[in-house]
Every structure is written in structure tokens, then in C-alpha cells.
A protein has these predicted regions:
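Bacterial N-terminal signal peptides that target proteins for export
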Residues: 1-10
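Small beta-barrel nucleic-acid-binding modules, primarily SNase/OB-fold domains
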Residues: 2, 18-146
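Bacterial N-terminal signal peptides
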Residues: 9-18
Length: 146
């Protein structure tokens, strides 16, 4: 029941509290959908993986990243540390599973996604990107440091 109560708690928080409260929130639950390489759904809650960029679906690398991630984490339990930000309909955070560890670091190591420097100012994915080599995908302008 921990999974259901964790999801219910975050949903209830979202109804009554400002977005800034999510800064310390942790969400644990089953991965129910992989939208693309850098967006998953935990329960019905969409999470944008912070500090990561992946090519869009409809591109060769984007489709590979999405299919790979789907094969690795669907129905697995993910724990996401939310940072209090929101982009479109998604909360933003870093997620991990018992099987993969940090999902972003794993996707970088597989050379399917890259470090988005602007949103990884703490350098969490810096070593993973150095080990993986240069990201072969398209680096969006919003990933460059300000």
C-alpha cells in the first residue's frame, strides 16, 4: 500500500499546496507510462527527468531512447526526488529504480540521452557524460548555461 499512499499523498498535496512545496517531495510508485526518453509517469503523475535531454520521438535516437527506457522501467517501482519546478503538465525531478539506479545517469551511459548543463548546474551528470563521451543527439539551446 506504500506505493498507492505515496502517489495519493503527492496528488493531495498538489490540490492544496503551492508548487514550491514540491521542493522536498519524494514520489514512489510504479512507472505506468514512458512518454519519451526524458518524461515518465509514476502512477498518473508525469515527471520530467531533470538535467537530461533526449532527442524527440520521431527521430531515430529519440525513438531508441523511448523504446529502451520503456523496456527497462515499465511497471517497475521508481522513486523520484522532485525539485519544486514544473514544466507544462510535468513535475520535475530525478528518478531511480532499484534495477537501473539513477535513470538519467543510466540513459547517458547508454548514449541515448545527454546532460542538459543548464538544468544540471550541480554537475550530478557531469561524470556520467564524460565517461559516455559527447552526446550524439541534438543539444537544445535551452540546455546551454545562461
Amino acid at each position: 500500500m506504500r506505493v498507492k499512499s505515496s502517489i495519493a499523498s503527492v496528488v493531495m498535496l498538489g490540490m492544496f499546496l503551492p508548487i514550491s512545496v514540491y521542493a522536498q517531495a519524494e514520489l514512489t510508485g510504479p512507472v505506468t507510462h514512458v512518454r519519451d526518453g526524458d518524461t515518465i509517469e509514476v502512477g498518473k503523475i508525469p515527471i520530467r527527468l531533470n538535467g537530461l535531454t533526449c532527442d524527440e520521438r520521431g527521430t531515430a535516437l529519440g525513438d531508441r531512447a523511448t523504446a529502451y527506457l520503456r523496456s527497462q522501467i515499465m511497471d517497475k517501482v521508481a522513486t523520484c526526488s522532485l525539485n519544486g519546478e514544473r514544466t507544462y503538465d510535468r513535475l520535475v525531478g530525478r528518478c531511480a529504480t532499484e534495477e537501473l539506479g539513477d535513470i538519467g545517469a543510466h540513459l547517458i551511459a547508454q548514449q541515448l540521452c545527454g546532460r542538459c548543463t543548464r538544468y544540471d548546474s550541480a554537475g550530478i551528470y557531469e561524470d556520467a557524460q564524460k565517461r559516455a563521451g559527447r552526446y550524439a543527439g541534438a543539444m537544445p539551446s535551452y540546455c546551454r548555461p545562461i
